Every structure is written in C-alpha cells, then in structure tokens.
C-alpha cells in the first residue's frame, strides 16, 4: 500500500506527449496549452503505454 501513496491522482498527473515535428517528449497537464515547448508545433501524439494491453477477439 505504501507504493501507491507516491502515485498522484490522474487529474494532477501530467501526460507525456511527443511532438509531431521535432519528436521531443513534453509533459502536458490538463490545463496546459497543447503546444511543443521546443518548437511550438501544435500536433502532439500521446506516448504509448508500457503496460500490457490485451484485446479479446470475439
């Protein structure tokens, strides 16, 4: 249980996005403008999760 205390709630935790132009990683919070901090480009891609994602075929 102590390990979960270090994790911030999802609303406050910044997401990591990758710039579509210069490919740098940017941490963007919920109220931050969607813009690269290096080049100012506005198209950002969400970084792929490292957690296992499984889809069931039906």
Swiss-Prot record:
What family does this belong to?
Belongs to the archaeal Rpo12/eukaryotic RPC10 RNA polymerase subunit family.
MF terms from GO for this chain are: DNA binding; DNA-directed RNA polymerase activity; zinc ion binding
Q: How does it assemble?
A: Component of the RNA polymerase I (Pol I), RNA polymerase II (Pol II) and RNA polymerase III (Pol III) complexes consisting of at least 13, 12 and 17 subunits, respectively. Pol I complex consists of a ten-subunit catalytic core composed of POLR1A/RPA1, POLR1B/RPA2, POLR1C/RPAC1, POLR1D/RPAC2, POLR1H/RPA12, POLR2E/RPABC1, POLR2F/RPABC2, POLR2H/RPABC3, POLR2K/RPABC4 and POLR2L/RPABC5; a mobile stalk subunit POLR1F/RPA43 protruding from the core and additional subunits homologous to general transcription factors POLR1E/RPA49 and POLR1G/RPA34.
One Pfam entry name: Zn_ribbon_RPAB4
| UniProt keyword annotation of Metal-binding present | yes
* Matches recorded under InterPro entries: RNAP_P/RPABC4 (IPR006591), RPABC4 (IPR039747), RPABC4/Spt4 (IPR029040)
Q: What does this protein do?
A: DNA-dependent RNA polymerase catalyzes the transcription of DNA into RNA using the four ribonucleoside triphosphates as substrates. Common component of RNA polymerases I, II and III which synthesize ribosomal RNA precursors, mRNA precursors and many functional non-coding RNAs, and a small RNAs, such as 5S rRNA and tRNAs, respectively.
Localization recorded for this chain is:
Nucleus; Nucleus, Nucleolus
In its UniProt entry, what is this protein called? DNA-directed RNA polymerases I, II, and III subunit RPABC4
* Zinc-finger ranges (C4-type): 19-39
A single Gene Ontology CC annotation of this entry is: nucleolus
Q: What keywords is this UniProt entry annotated with?
A: DNA-directed RNA polymerase, Metal-binding, Nucleus, Transcription, Zinc, Zinc-finger
Question: Is Metal-binding included in the keywords of this UniProt record?
Answer: yes
GO terms (BP aspect): transcription by RNA polymerase II
Residues given in the record as Zn(2+) binding sites: 19, 22, 36, 39
């Amino acid at each position: 249980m102590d390990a979960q205390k270090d994790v911030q709630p999802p609303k406050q935790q910044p997401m990591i996005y990758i710039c579509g132009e210069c490919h740098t990683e940017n941490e963007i919070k919920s109220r931050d403008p969607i813009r690269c901090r290096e080049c100012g480009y506005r198209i950002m891609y969400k970084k792929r999760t490292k957690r296992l994602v499984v889809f069931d075929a039906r």
